[in-house]
């Protein structure tokens, strides 16, 4: 029978000092012996996805204590990628994932906590907490802050839905008037919550459901909706049940590594491909798998990308559907239900509810259940009122979207495409692979060949695109922006956005060893591995070289002979693998990150071999 970790600090005369300090935090005599459960919050006033979380940690804490635990809350940092984007701040985004994972480990291990509730939401916070959960392997439940309502505005006598990316595109389009640009800016992000499309934050919150580590609705139920309060209440109650199952009943099925198994990671990846999730999720799933010693890598992702169809199309791949529409169609459970009916789900994997996915689908899939309570839950909708308050409205759709032929979520037979929403491409320019969000690629450019226009940084690329150096038919190459080369693997949302604003969104390709925002669409290929700074062939591309992209056949190649490539490599070895004449201030903290960073095909995690021996 495992011993409560917290007993180290709460039992024995030699722990009198620790107990004295616990008492000073409010622990009473009768509490010693109860499980100590960390409430890992991420409240900050910098991020709309986290601005409403301040009181939610204590909401969870009260439920933990009512159920027989001791709740202790702490906070992690949280970077807003949208605000950090387009300047030096973006260098810090991906490295913050490692800091979050480490800070959770530090706090939980330093104080011998027995279990965790992770209150996450935005881009690097959920992955960082997920990495920590797999690393620590103590009972955990995730509950996110929830998605933002979609923005709405009236243009040309039509009400259209909006999100952050619309504001960015319109702001950079010289043909759009200042008045219209400001109108869209003011309407794009109306409430608290993670940005309203299937961007990185919402993708990751959906994936925690598929991994089995969060409750139904976690990925899709709006931040503003009153129903979301119950997810926080239930998380506080369930974590005590999970904790006692493990420590008092020796039930190891309550541990995250026994919930988020390889089968669960494959379920999460199947969901990601089916819903056309952010390419960043590939990085984060690979990183979390390594933390949990799960045998899941790019080979698995490539295999699955060839099997799973695109069943759910959401912004930025369409303007028609946002996260509120996904929820109305049954949320993550609805998509997993269709994957199950297509034979593409490991339905015996378990979840934090203690159910197999087969059992959970029977209860929560709107296409199967008879429960009016469940159907009412999935009719939770937007109010259209600007607010930063959680649980502030109780609006509902009149009907569910159960149209699996032409609705937001579709059957395999009626899929948006039989080819999934993400693909792994390989070739001489990316021997270890690169990633493209096929859900956002127009069918006319699934095969594309063009001359390279090479930039050594995102800043130069932005200047070049806006300055007219890129024309229709070109392949924009942005290199030395990987985890080590950036450092920090910046998101390339501004270059892709400006290509659209210049009318080149369907006429150009972009290849980078950096990454993309979940808001990116178009023929945008990222994570080229190895990255240029690690000797990757993307560092050998010269201006005008032809690059051939073939998504259906999963290939990408530099049309240069092997002999020429070898000569260029020898030349680059002598010069050193670094950008030419790039002016960029890199802090000591970022240099420390770069010194241990691996390429994207490894999840951009730290190179553990550098700590051995």
From Swiss-Prot:
Cofactors demanded by this protein: [2Fe-2S] cluster; Mg(2+)
UniProt-listed Pfam families: ILV_EDD_C, ILVD_EDD_N
Modified residues (N6-carboxylysine): 124
Gene Ontology BP terms: isoleucine biosynthetic process; L-valine biosynthetic process
Coiled coil segments of this chain: none
Pathway: Amino-acid biosynthesis; L-isoleucine biosynthesis; L-isoleucine from 2-oxobutanoate: step 3/4; Amino-acid biosynthesis; L-valine biosynthesis; L-valine from pyruvate: step 3/4
Residues involved in [2Fe-2S] cluster binding: 122, 195
Record InterPro entries: Dihydro-acid_dehy_C, DihydroxyA_deHydtase, DiOHA_6PGluconate_deHydtase_CS, ILV_EDD_C, ILV_EDD_N, IlvD/EDD_N
Catalysis performed (reactions): (2R)-2,3-dihydroxy-3-methylbutanoate = 3-methyl-2-oxobutanoate + H2O; (2R,3R)-2,3-dihydroxy-3-methylpentanoate = (S)-3-methyl-2-oxopentanoate + H2O
Gene Ontology cellular-component terms listed: cytosol
Signal peptide stretch: none
Highest taxon in the source lineage: Bacteria
Binding positions for Mg(2+) per the UniProt entry: 81, 123-124, 491
Cofactor binding remark: Binds 1 [2Fe-2S] cluster per subunit. This cluster acts as a Lewis acid cofactor.
Active site: 517
Keywords attached to this entry: 2Fe-2S, Amino-acid biosynthesis, Branched-chain amino acid biosynthesis, Iron, Iron-sulfur, Lyase, Magnesium, Metal-binding
Subunit structure: Homodimer.
Entry function: Functions in the biosynthesis of branched-chain amino acids. Catalyzes the dehydration of (2R,3R)-2,3-dihydroxy-3-methylpentanoate (2,3-dihydroxy-3-methylvalerate) into 2-oxo-3-methylpentanoate (2-oxo-3-methylvalerate) and of (2R)-2,3-dihydroxy-3-methylbutanoate (2,3-dihydroxyisovalerate) into 2-oxo-3-methylbutanoate (2-oxoisovalerate), the penultimate precursor to L-isoleucine and L-valine, respectively.
Family: Belongs to the IlvD/Edd family.
Name of protein: Dihydroxy-acid dehydratase
């Amino acid at each position: 029978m495992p011993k409560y970790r917290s007993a180290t600090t709460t039992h024995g005369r030699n722990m009198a000092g620790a107990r004295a300090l616990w008492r000073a935090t409010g622990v009473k005599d009768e509490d010693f012996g109860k499980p100590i459960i960390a409430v890992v919050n991420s409240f900050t006033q910098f991020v709309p996805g986290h601005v409403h979380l301040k009181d939610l940690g204590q909401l969870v804490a009260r439920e933990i204590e009512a159920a027989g635990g001791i709740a202790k809350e702490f906070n992690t940092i949280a970077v807003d990628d949208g605000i950090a984007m387009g300047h030096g701040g973006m260098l810090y985004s991906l490295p913050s994932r490692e800091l979050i994972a480490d800070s959770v480990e530090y706090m939980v291990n330093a104080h011998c906590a027995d279990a965790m509730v992770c209150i996450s939401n935005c881009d690097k916070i959920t992955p960082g907490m997920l990495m920590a959960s797999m690393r620590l392997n103590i009972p955990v439940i995730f509950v996110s802050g929830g998605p933002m309502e979609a923005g709405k505005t009236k243009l040309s006598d039509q009400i259209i839905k909006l999100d952050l990316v619309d504001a960015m595109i319109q702001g950079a389009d010289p043909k759009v008037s200042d008045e219209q640009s400001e109108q869209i800016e003011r309407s794009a992000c109306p409430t608290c919550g993670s940005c309203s499309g299937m961007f990185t934050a919402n993708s990751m919150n959906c994936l925690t459901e598929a991994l089995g580590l969060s409750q139904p609705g976690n990925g899709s139920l709006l931040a503003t909706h009153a129903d979301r309060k119950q997810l926080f209440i239930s998380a506080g109650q369930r974590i005590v049940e999970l904790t006692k199952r493990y420590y008092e009943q020796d039930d190891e099925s309550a541990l995250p590594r026994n919930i988020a198994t390889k089968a669960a990671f494959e379920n999460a990846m199947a969901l990601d491909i089916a819903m056309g999730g952010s390419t960043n999720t590939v990085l984060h799933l690979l990183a979390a798998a390594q933390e949990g010693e799960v045998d899941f890598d790019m080979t698995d992702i490539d295999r699955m990308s060839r099997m799973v169809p695109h069943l759910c199309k959401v912004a930025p791949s369409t303007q028609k559907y946002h996260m509120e529409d996904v929820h109305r169609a049954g949320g993550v459970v609805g998509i997993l239900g269709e994957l199950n009916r297509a034979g593409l789900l490991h339905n015996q994997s378990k979840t934090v509810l203690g159910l197999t996915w087969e059992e959970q689908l029977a209860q929560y899939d709107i296409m199967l259940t008879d429960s009016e309570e469940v159907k009412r839950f999935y009719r939770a909708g937007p109010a259209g009122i600007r607010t930063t308050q959680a649980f502030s409205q109780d609006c509902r759709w009149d009907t569910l979207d159960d149209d699996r032929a032409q609705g937001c979520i579709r059957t395999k037979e009626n899929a948006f495409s039989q080819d999934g929403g993400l693909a792994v491409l390989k070739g001489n320019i990316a021997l270890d692979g690169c990633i493209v969000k096929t859900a956002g690629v127009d069918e006319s450019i699934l095969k594309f060949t063009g001359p390279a226009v090479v930039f050594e940084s995102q800043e130069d690329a932005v200047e070049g695109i806006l300055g007219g150096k890129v024309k229709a038919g070109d392949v924009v190459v942005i290199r030395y922006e990987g985890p080590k080369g950036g450092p920090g693997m910046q998101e390339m949302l501004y270059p892709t956005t400006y290509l659209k604003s210049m009318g080149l969104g369907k006429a150009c390709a972009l290849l980078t060893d950096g990454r993309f925002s979940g808001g990116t669409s178009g023929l945008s290929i990222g994570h080229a591995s190895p990255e240029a700074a690690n000797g990757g062939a993307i560092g050998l591309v010269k201006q005008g070289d032809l690059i051939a992209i073939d998504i259906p056949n999963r290939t990408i190649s530099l049309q240069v002979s092997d002999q020429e490539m070898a000569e260029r490599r020898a030349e680059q070895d002598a010069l050193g693998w670094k950008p030419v004449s790039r002016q960029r201030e890199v802090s000591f903290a970022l240099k420390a990150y770069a010194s241990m960073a691996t390429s994207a095909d490894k999840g951009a995690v730290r190179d553990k071999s550098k700590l051995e021996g």
